[in-house]
Structure formats: structure tokens, C-alpha cells
Amino acid sequence: MKRDVFSSGFTRREVLALGTGAAAALAVPELSRAAAPATTVAIVRCRSYSDFRAKLATAFDQIGGIQKLVQGKTVGLKLNLTGNPARFPLTPNLPYRTNGDTVANTVYLLAKAGAKRVRIIESFFPATEDLGLWARYGIDVNAVNNMGTKVDWENVQNLGKYKQYVRLKVPWGGYMYPAYYLNQAFVDCDVYASLSKLKNHWIAGVTMSMKNNFGDTPCSLYGGDCGSDGNEHPTKERGPVLHQGKTKAPKGVDAELHPDSPRDPGYRVPRILVDQVGIRPVDLAIVDGVETVRGGEGPWLPGLERMTPGVIIAGRNPVCVDTVGMAVMSYSAKADRGSSPFVRGDNSLKLAEAVGIGTTDLNRIEIAGLSIAEAKIDFGPGAVGKTMKELKAEQKS
């Protein structure tokens, strides 16, 4: 598949065909019109992060192992470090971000399976490549660097160490945009893994292995202060461009397919996140439900509270994994907008299923390890601005 790259000048004449230097870039498969694929999903019990390595290894074994997937390969590992720590510092009693121990132990298992390199990927502010910034999230960079394989740390909020962006076309034409420009770290890996949390989301209803990829888009091009020419030193998040559609992306970046479509974030966010999964398919989905939160994605939201499901969910297909994750949260992946947990937005899992990424039919998904009944925990109605205690008090009154 031919890709375009986009340099920091941000003009149309600088949109070039990706050359031979990117021959190893990801080939996005054409999606079949047949039934969306179903793969095995593992659920394992894990009550403590001290057991995470052994339990995740068990989950990998239950889905058929990962050696064939990663041996001799470069693996991209996308984290979920949502929330600027300058405003929202580490909050141990609200474990809504990727846990540092899960990063180290996942890298260890990838190395043990033969991965030659792991690119740890996330977008955050400030948009620099300072390794010290990762420690703000409780990640021991030195420990991760000594897990048995070469490790690169990529803040993909802008160009980073690269000179050009890569243009990735959405295989089915796109829900919101026909293509997106990303940092080249996303194609400088043979395998792409999503390490996410099991939690609610204010707009998307839930956030797991698929929603984790919404942050793939660089704020230099899709942030609120991207301007008409792009901004390699962004300070504003994606709301004006992606969530609300009030601000256009810079010159040279693909425009929306349907500018007359709703400006409602509940319409836009689910479709953009499915586009993101389409342009950079998830080869390995890991959902951390050891400790997490319910009621939303972070402490800027009312009603957020700690949850301890004590599970890890893993598989090769993000839709299948998130479908099982929803069942563990006591939700249905078949639910429509307006029913729990899709209080404010459309169901991204059904949108992904519609374009052939994966199935939301639990009857077609083989579940290894714990059964859903054994793992299930009540996450309540979703992100409604109230804790479970407050909701129960309302029911009694």
C-alpha cells in the first residue's frame, strides 16, 4: 500500500509518496465484507500488580502464545497515559492510567518471546522526547530498558525524532476522514500492541484496547492550537478539531469527508477512533483490569471512583477483546446509544464490526481462562457523574 508523508512545513506541495525507505511499513489489509472475524480472548485472575507478569504470560499462552507474532520483530506498545500530569498528577487511589509495572512486565514478556525491539508509544505534553517525562507517570525507564530487548520511547504528539509524518488511509474510506497523518513510529514497527485500562469513558461509553488509539493523532496537526500550518509545539488537546469539529486541521492534512455531519462529540469520537484502529490495526490487545476506575476516564470527571476487578483480558482482535471486556463490566457490546454505558455517544464496537474489524457477538468468541460469570463486576450505568454509592442512595430515596 502506498503512503504519503508530510513534513514540518505543512504545505500541500510537501505531501510526497512514501519512498523505498518505508518498504517495511505496515500493510493495512483489505477488510472482508464477510462476517467480522472472531478470535480467542483470555480472561485471567490477577489481584495484584506483583503477579502481573505471570498472569499475563498465562493469558498469552491461552490465546496460542505470542512467539510467532513477535519473534525477530519490532513491537509498538501503545500506553494509556491520559491526562496532563501538570494538572492531574499521579493519584494512587484512582488508577486510571497505565501502571508502570504493567509496562515493564509486558516488555519483559515481549522480549522473552523474541521481540528484537519494543517502541513504547504515547502522546503527551510537553511535546518533547525528554525521557524524564515518562517518570511522571510512575514508569521506571531504566528498569524497562533492562528487560532483555532494545527499547525506544516515542512521544508521538508531534514529529518527534522524525522529519516527516506518515499519511495512512482508512481501508474502507473512513468514517470521518479518508486518511490521517501520524508520527512514523506507528509504521516503524512490525507488530502493534495496545496496553489499555478497563474503564468507562464520558463520551465513548467505554475505553479499552480500541479507544486507546484515539491518542495516536498528534496534537501538532489535530490539537486546538494547530493553526493553518501546524504547530510542532502544541499545548492544546484535540477537542476543537476532532471532538467538536469546530477547527479545521492544517493545510495539507485531509479534510473531513462529511463537513455537514453532526458536530456532536458523541457522533464524532466513536467514528474517529474506529478510523484509527483501521489505519493502524491492533495485533495484540491487553486490557488491565487489575485496578482501575469507573464513571469515566480520569479525575477531571465527577463520579469517578476506584474499582478492583482483578482481571487481565488479552487477545489478538481488539473488537473481540473489548466485547469481552464490556461483558466483564456487566454491559452488552450490542447496546445502542442512550443505553448503558453509551450515555452520550454511539457504540464504537458496532461501528468497528460494521467495517469488518471484529465481531461483537459473544457466541462467536472463544473465551479461555475465567468465564465471564466468574470475572463479571458491576460498573454501574456508565459515566453519569455519580458514584455507585450516590446512585444507590438515589434508588432508595
Over which residues does each language-model region extend?
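Functionally engaged cysteine thiol sites
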Residues: 7, 19, 298
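Sec/Tat signal peptide C-region and signal peptidase I cleavage site
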Residues: 31-33
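Extended, low-polarity segments enriched in aliphatic/aromatic residues
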Residues: 35-397
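Sec-dependent signal peptide hydrophobic core
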Residues: 19-23, 193
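N-terminal secretory signal peptides
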Residues: 1-10
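Hydrophobic h-region of N-terminal signal peptides that target proteins for export
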Residues: 23-29
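A short, amphipathic alpha-helical segment
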Residues: 17-20, 330
